[in-house]
């Protein structure tokens, strides 16, 4: 491989960092925050002193979110018993601290006084909007609550963070608990690349034969190509009942979801909202619950006609194979066949046009054409050999960095997401440049061939990169708070 220049931005030392160190850093950051809150007994007198309090809050938040960001990232992409234990053990303290911060009366009043002052209009627009958002967040975290209600909010908040973590762990564990060895006859219809992938999954589980897992690349391959209808049904049922009352009771999310729903409702009512949906929209663009509801209904009505037509086509095609009742585990398989018949176009035939290295090159050159930003791969410590680090440069000036971790593997949560590691903000040592993680679950490379992406995966990559770019290009100086 070509040698890369070292990262120019300060990046986390994933090759050296231990869970014990991370835990200590997080505990120390929480400690510093709590000390700061204890000392802030009243609103400072001058606007200078008030703005200085706001700046200190941003720095404390920056410290904590940086070390917590590394831990929660590892918990999502390299999940194992040790990481999970440290993560779980810190949740109560973290939740307690954020509740304390969000309900701190003197701090809230400091923000309020800055907003009410004559000096407010002269602040940079980004800072004004950050202050308005902070005031909104205080209200949403119960700053106005008193006595029992205040205590109850803190309990609910802590419990919800625990339940949300349990929920994710159950899904991950249930996904990984499933493995079905496949006989040759069951591979009928699968293209060579999918068979090689299932072979690789089998080897990883210590088997001498291909195996189906519930990882999305394996699941999609079988639902799209496997001629064996019984196999498709078995995988469909296993996949859709993960972490449910129909699976292993150890991973059952039913009680978790019931408790989350009832606590969310209680929390919303404590804060004066009629429902959790209403509470949730208080920090979103949509004006109210009815608007969102109507939007979804309109969307469904527009989609209904074409959907009915497509289902009719699939039913007709399945009937040719003697299938009288089209089931959910048949739609992926017959959709692919229909595309082949109508357009002579298969996902598989497109794949050679989308090798991952070429797609990244294409993505980066589009960004360069549209925004005049160059993307350069740099050497940086990573959590897994698949992960890579890049920096964005504009006329020789580094704007920020990002990591790509694109392929599905065991110990990694499903889906695709972007999470910030460090935000752009002015600190004591000058301007801090932003860095984020972009994570996907694409079909991994098999053997020493480059990974070949499906058209859907290419779409996802461009979508996630859009989030990342928006995050990196934003010029606001202050952090999220």
Please report, for each region that a protein language model flagged, where it lies by residue.
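Conserved small/polar residues in nucleotide/adenosyl-binding loops
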Residues: 475-480
């Amino acid at each position: 491989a070509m040698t890369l220049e070292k990262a120019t931005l300060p990046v986390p030392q994933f090759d050296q960092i231990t869970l014990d160190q991370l835990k200590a850093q997080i505990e120390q950051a929480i400690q510093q925050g709590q000390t700061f809150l204890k000392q802030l007994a009243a609103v400072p007198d001058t606007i200078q002193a008030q703005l200085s309090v706001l700046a200190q809050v941003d720095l404390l938040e920056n410290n904590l979110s940086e070390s917590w960001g590394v831990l929660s990232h590892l918990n999502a992409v390299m999940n194992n018993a040790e990481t999970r234990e440290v993560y779980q053990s810190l949740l109560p303290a973290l939740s307690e601290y954020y509740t304390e911060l969000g309900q701190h009366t003197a701090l809230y009043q400091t923000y309020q006084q800055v907003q009410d002052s004559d000096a407010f209009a002269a602040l940079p627009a980004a800072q004004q909007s950050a202050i308005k958002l902070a005031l909104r967040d205080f209200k949403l975290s119960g700053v106005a609550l008193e006595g029992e209600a205040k205590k109850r909010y803190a309990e609910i908040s802590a419990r919800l963070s625990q339940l949300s973590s349990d929920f994710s762990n159950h899904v991950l564990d249930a996904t990984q608990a499933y493995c079905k060895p496949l006989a040759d006859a069951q591979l009928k219809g699968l293209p060579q690349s999918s068979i090689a992938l299932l072979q690789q999954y089998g080897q990883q589980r210590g088997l001498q034969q291909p195996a189906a897992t519930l990882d999305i690349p394996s699941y999609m391959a079988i639902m799209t190509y496997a001629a064996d209808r019984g196999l498709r049904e078995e995988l469909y049922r296993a996949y859709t009942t993960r972490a449910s009352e129909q699976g292993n009771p150890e991973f059952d999310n039913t009680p978790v979801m019931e408790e989350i729903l009832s606590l969310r409702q209680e929390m919303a009512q404590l804060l004066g909202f009629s429902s959790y949906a209403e509470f949730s929209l208080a920090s979103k663009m949509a004006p109210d619950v009815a608007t969102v509801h109507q939007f979804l209904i309109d969307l469904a009505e527009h989609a209904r006609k074409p959907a009915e037509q497509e289902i009719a086509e699939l039913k007709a095609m399945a009937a040719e194979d003697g299938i009288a009742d089209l089931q959910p585990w048949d739609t992926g398989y017959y959709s692919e066949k229909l595309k082949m018949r109508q357009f002579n176009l298969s996902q598989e035939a497109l794949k050679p046009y989308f090798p991952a290295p070429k797609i990244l090159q294409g993505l980066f050159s589009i960004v360069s054409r549209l925004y005049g930003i160059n993307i350069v791969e740099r050497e940086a410590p990573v959590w897994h050999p698949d992960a890579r680090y890049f920096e964005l440069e504009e006329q020789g000036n580094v704007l920020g960095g990002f990591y790509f971790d694109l392929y599905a593997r065991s110990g990694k949560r499903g889906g695709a997401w972007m999470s910030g590691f460090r935000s752009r903000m002015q600190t004591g040592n000058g301007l801090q440049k932003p860095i984020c993680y972009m994570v996907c679950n694409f079909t991994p490379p098999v053997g020493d061939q480059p990974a070949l992406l499906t058209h859907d995966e290419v779409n996802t990559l461009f979508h996630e990169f859009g989030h990342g770019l928006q995050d990196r290009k934003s010029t606001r100086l202050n952090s999220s708070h």
